């Protein structure tokens, strides 16, 4: 007799802002307008949510600053973010969980479902480092907000500090691959090239003439145009 398949135990959380012009991806302005930056943010969020939908999970939660929009697919519970600095908001999200939870942001649209499949028998925590020194994923088998609260955020040492916090608590840490956050025009071009089939890449291709010259530092003409052409060719 075949044993029944185990149900996924992980709650997958996405912490995000409503993609409103002037509130998201402001480091893309310039070269983008606020509206273009928000469109890139919405596409990144849509790709992220799609990856979460395709990953094994007991529950999927959007921890949202703002209001849901047409970019939110069915299958997610929506939990409002609390106020305060980022470490407090992350801590509050984990505090609301009763079992294993993996939290990611909206800045890595290249994430794939397989990266979000966690083997909790082999790990007490999951850590995904970001190229800028932060982290793109944090998972806890036993959610403990104290493991996040007080971690200095948005610094080049944030990721190292957070990982050291996990290790100092005696946790077995499973490391995920490093991913690049989308914060700048150069980030947008690089990430779009890594995941050319997604909505983020399509939006970046539409804005290639804006993004690529700045990303390469070549100006609007000359060699910078090569990058714009490369983005269009991946369509």
Language-model regions, residue ranges each:
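Short phosphate-binding loop-to-helix
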Residues: 72-102, 155-158
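Short glycine-enriched loops at secondary-structure junctions
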Residues: 15-20, 65-66, 131-133
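Conserved donor-nucleotide/metal-binding helix-loop-beta segment in metal-dependent transferases, i.e.
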Residues: 111-133
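Short, glycine-/small-residue-rich phosphate/pyrophosphate-handling segment
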Residues: 141-166
């Amino acid at each position: 007799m075949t044993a029944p398949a185990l149900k996924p135990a992980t709650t997958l959380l996405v912490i995000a802002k409503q993609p409103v012009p002037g509130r998201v991806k402001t480091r893309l302005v310039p070269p983008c307008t606020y509206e273009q930056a928000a469109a890139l943010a919405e596409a990144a969020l849509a790709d992220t949510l799609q990856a979460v939908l395709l990953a094994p999970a007991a529950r999927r939660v959007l921890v949202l600053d703002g209001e849901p929009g047409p970019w939110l697919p069915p299958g997610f519970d929506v939990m409002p973010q609390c106020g305060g600095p980022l470490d407090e908001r992350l801590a509050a999200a984990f505090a609301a969980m009763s079992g294993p939870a993996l939290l990611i942001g909206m800045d890595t649209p290249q994430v794939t479902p397989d990266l979000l499949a966690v083997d909790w028998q082999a790990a007490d925590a999951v850590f995904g480092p970001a190229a800028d020194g932060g982290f793109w994923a944090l998972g806890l088998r036993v959610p403990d907000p104290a493991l996040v609260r007080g971690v200095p955020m948005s610094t080049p040492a944030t990721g190292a500090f957070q990982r050291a916090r996990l290790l100092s608590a005696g946790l077995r840490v499973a490391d995920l691959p490093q991913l690049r956050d989308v914060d700048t025009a150069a980030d947008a071009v690089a990430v779009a090239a890594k995941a050319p089939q997604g909505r983020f890449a399509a939006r970046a291709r539409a804005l290639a003439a804006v993004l690529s010259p700045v990303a390469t530092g070549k100006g609007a003409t000359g060699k910078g145009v090569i990058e714009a052409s490369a983005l269009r060719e991946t369509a």
